[in-house]
């Protein structure tokens, strides 16, 4: 159950959602058929977030193992199974990071990495902006760390 929850949290963070959005999700916000869920971001703005087939499998297993009736998607491991908090996720990620000799593991790094990977793979910046729930595209540009090799390839492709 613990391992399943960890995998689910890791998978959910790979969607690009904020940790604050993650902890607000309820079970019935999940649409397994469409592999998406509704999250409430900054300013309580609603948006859709998408997840892959692996995440769907992990989420279903996790929910099958749950015995509590809390509507929250992620809850504490012990009674009374209260909704997981932002600090709870952050502490757990730091612990997991230390286990594999990574310092300063933070949920926000998942968002930055996801933005960078999406752009590196050719996802249009406007779609990355929407995926991350940014109002301003400047915020998205600030998140993404541009790979110098990709700059070189793009230069050769477009300007040679």
Predicted segments — roles?
Residues 52-102:
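Active-site/catalytic core of tyrosine-dependent DNA strand-transfer enzymes
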Residues 18, 26-28, 124, 135-138:
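Short coil/turn motifs that cap or connect alpha-helices
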Residues 107-108, 143:
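Catalytic tyrosine of NAD(P)H-dependent dehydrogenase/reductases that use a Tyr as the general acid/base
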Residues 10, 14, 111-135:
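C-terminal catalytic core of tyrosine-transesterase DNA break-rejoin enzymes
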Residues 15, 82-85, 113-116, 139-140:
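Ser/Thr-centric signal marking residues that sit
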Residues 1-9:
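Single conserved hydrophobic/aromatic residue that forms the stacking wall/gate
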Residues 132, 137-157:
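Catalytic-site neighborhood detector that most strongly recognizes the C-terminal catalytic loop/helix
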Residues 15, 20, 24-61:
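Conserved tyrosine-mediated DNA breakage-rejoining catalytic core shared by Y-recombinases
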